[in-house]
Each structure stands twice: as C-alpha cells, then as structure tokens.
C-alpha cells in the first residue's frame, strides 16, 4: 500500500538510506501483540491500540518498528550481519498530536564489532539529521545501561533488587522510589501467620506443602495461576527484598553515579575516577564504554556535541547497553533515539544470539524543526 502524506523531505531521507547501502524493509501494520506487551516497556504498552483476530489471538496496530523488523528477519532466516531501513506509520495513543505518525530508522543486526556498530548508529543518526537540518547544531545525550548494571552488581545487592533497579533505569521517579525503599525497607505484611512463619524459617518444602493444602482446601487450581512452588519462591524473594537495607555509603555511591553528567570526551575519565573512589570494579562495562568513545572518534563523529549522562535511559525494556537521543541544541524535542538491544532477537525466537543496535527518527518533529527556520 503506497504511503500518503509523507513529509516533503522523505525522498531526501530515503536517498540517505540508499547511500548507506541498507536494505529497505516493510512490515505489516497489524502485529502480534504479545512481544510488545512482554518487552516493550510500560510507557509503550499503555499506548498500544489493541484488537484481536477471529480466533481470539491478541493483535495490535504497529506501535514501533524495531520488534517487527526483528521478527521479519527471523521469519526469513536471513543471515547476518544485515542492515535494514524502514519508513512507515506507527500508531500510539497520545495526549498531544496525532495517534498515527511516520517513523523511519535503521536496524543494524549481527555486527560483532560492538563499538564500531554503536558508533555507526550514532554517526548515521546525526549525519542524516545534519543533512535534513542544515546549519542546526545537534545535541546528543548518551546513556549506558550496561555501566549502570555493573555498578549495581559491584555493590553486591541481592539479585532481586538488582533486577528491580535495572528495570527502572532511565525512569528517575521510579528509581528514586526504589532507592528510598532500600534505605528504609518496608517489611512484608498481610501474610497468614502460618505462611509468615514458614517463609521466615526458610523451609521451602514445608511452605510448598502448606500452600498445596490451602489451595486444595479452597478449591483453587494451580492451572489457573502460579504453582505452590512458584508462590513459595516469590514469597521468599519478597522477604529477602524487604529485609535488604542499603547502607549509607552504598546509597551515596549510587547517588554519585547517577549524578554524573559530563561531555563525552571527559566521560571515560569521570567513570574511572568514580570507580576508583568508590572501590568498584566495573570491568568489561567500562572497557566497552571506552571502546565506543574511541570508535566514535575514529568514525569522525563530532564528539563536542555528545554528552554522557549516567542516569539517562529510554522507556523501552529491550535495551541492554548504549542508549541515545538527538535534539537540536536548545530544544527539548527528541528527533532521533535508539540504542543497543542484544537480547531482543533471542527473546523473539532467534536460535543464535544476534547483537543489534538501531535508531528511529520522529518525522513529524523533524518537519516542525525544518519549518521553524
């Protein structure tokens, strides 16, 4: 189906894609809803237009392109490395603006040279925007979820707390609430006395047996929800989380990390200084970060317009490392955004691990920026 009402610069954008030797790809507007509901993140989930098939399968209008492009790559059993470009409509419930709008972007799948692929994504995003917005100075904000994960792991927090904090990365309101809970733990309440004693005892088998008896007595079927073992382990995890307290020193370390906001050219030194002062070993996460900075310089990207903000993330759950957004300097409107999603294709059914990075353009915002000249 031909695209209509495309912005007038669409042909220039497609020419930029062609110059980068990427393969144009199209995906169906109607998509299976499950992948988006499972891994797209709460911010996107609540904006999805849902429907269902005659057989009751949950479907949705395409809310973004990364997941559909990855699904199409898996379905066609195409080899890697592979670079795809797309341009088409996405559909999201929004308070302001149209609920259907155009996005375009590039997904880079299977390049095992991670620093080079990351640098290429940022270079392509900024390079294309520079052609579409001549004379405008761009501003790029970078974050790195892998560095945050390394900090959280180095502090030795229980795995459950690590997962919670990592899941909240990029959402400062949620992250601050979790940190407040770590400083002043909220103990588990509302449990039956017998269940509470069994959870506290650590006797998993006894707790499972008790839960089985209670479920049988109340006529509750395990097929209708979690099994007794799953419930027991969930209760145990909740108890561990509720009893975990982050000491003042560790809390201040996290606060110090999340406050880092420096030009990218100074970021490697700032992270190394932070790690040394805190006595943390960030290992591979820091070396990968440094490799990306070097790759950006080697690719000729103007580092003077790039900033690193340790607390910066993007509201999509599938990101695993680099995240970035591009604006015109002095403007809050995000014109392009992207990041690395190395686990996404495996989650969607790929038999092999496929490293991946990509970005998308908001064409309506670019059009507005062009009109403001």
From Swiss-Prot:
Any one GO biological process: L-histidine biosynthetic process
Record bears the keyword Cytoplasm: yes
Subcellular location field: Cytoplasm
One MF annotation (Gene Ontology) recorded for this entry: histidine-tRNA ligase activity
Keywords: Amino-acid biosynthesis, Cytoplasm, Histidine biosynthesis
Pfam families tied to this protein: tRNA-synt_His
CC per GO annotation: cytoplasm
Pathway(s) this gene product operates in, as recorded in its UniProt entry: Amino-acid biosynthesis; L-histidine biosynthesis; L-histidine from 5-phospho-alpha-D-ribose 1-diphosphate: step 1/9
Highest taxon of the lineage: Bacteria
NCBIfam families: PRK12295.1-4
Subunit structure: Heteromultimer composed of HisG and HisZ subunits.
Family of this protein: Belongs to the class-II aminoacyl-tRNA synthetase family. HisZ subfamily.
Its job: Required for the first step of histidine biosynthesis. May allow the feedback regulation of ATP phosphoribosyltransferase activity by histidine.
Note: This function is generally fulfilled by the C-terminal part of HisG, which is missing in some bacteria such as this one.
Protein name: ATP phosphoribosyltransferase regulatory subunit
Organism in which the protein naturally occurs: Rhizobium leguminosarum bv. trifolii (strain WSM2304)
Gene: hisZ
């Amino acid at each position: 189906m031909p695209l209509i009402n495309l912005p007038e610069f669409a042909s220039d954008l497609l020419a930029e894609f062609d110059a980068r030797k990427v393969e144009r790809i199209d995906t169906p507007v109607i998509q299976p809803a499950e992948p988006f509901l499972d891994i797209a993140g709460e911010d996107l989930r609540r904006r999805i237009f849902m429907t269902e098939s005659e057989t009751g399968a949950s479907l949705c209008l395409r809310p973004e392109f990364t997941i559909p492009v990855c699904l199409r790559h898996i379905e066609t059993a195409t080899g890697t490395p592979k670079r795809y470009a797309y341009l088409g409509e996405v559909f999201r419930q929004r308070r302001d603006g149209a609920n259907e709008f155009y996005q375009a972007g590039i997904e880079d799948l299977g390049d095992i040279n991670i620093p080079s692929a990351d640098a290429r994504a940022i270079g392509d995003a900024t390079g294309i925007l520079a052609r579409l917005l001549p004379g405008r100075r761009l501003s790029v904000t970078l974050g790195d979820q892998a560095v945050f994960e390394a900090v959280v792991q180095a502090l030795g927090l229980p795995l459950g707390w690590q997962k919670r904090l990592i899941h909240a990365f990029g959402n400062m309101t949620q992250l601050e609430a979790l940190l407040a809970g770590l400083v002043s733990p909220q103990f588990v309440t509302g449990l039956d006395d017998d269940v509470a004693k069994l959870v506290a005892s650590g006797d998993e088998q006894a707790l499972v047996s008790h839960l089985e008896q209670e479920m049988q007595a109340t006529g509750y079927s395990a097929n209708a929800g979690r099994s007794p073992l799953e419930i027991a382990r969930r209760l145990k995890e909740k108890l561990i989380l509720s009893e975990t307290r982050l000491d003042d020193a560790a809390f201040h370390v996290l606060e110090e990390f999340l406050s880092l906001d420096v030009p990218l050219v100074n970021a490697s030194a700032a992270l190394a200084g932070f790690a040394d002062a805190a006595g943390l070993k960030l290992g591979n996460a820091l070396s990968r970060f440094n490799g990306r900075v070097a790759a950006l310089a080697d690719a000729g990207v103007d580092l003077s317009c790039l900033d690193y903000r340790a607390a910066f993330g993007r509201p999509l759950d599938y990101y695993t490392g680099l995240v970035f957004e591009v604006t015109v300097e002095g403007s809050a409107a995000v014109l392009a955004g992207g990041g690395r999603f190395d686990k996404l294709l495996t989650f969607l059914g790929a038999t092999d691990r496929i490293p991946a990075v990509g970005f998308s353009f908001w064409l309506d915002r670019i059009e507005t920026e062009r009109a403001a000249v």
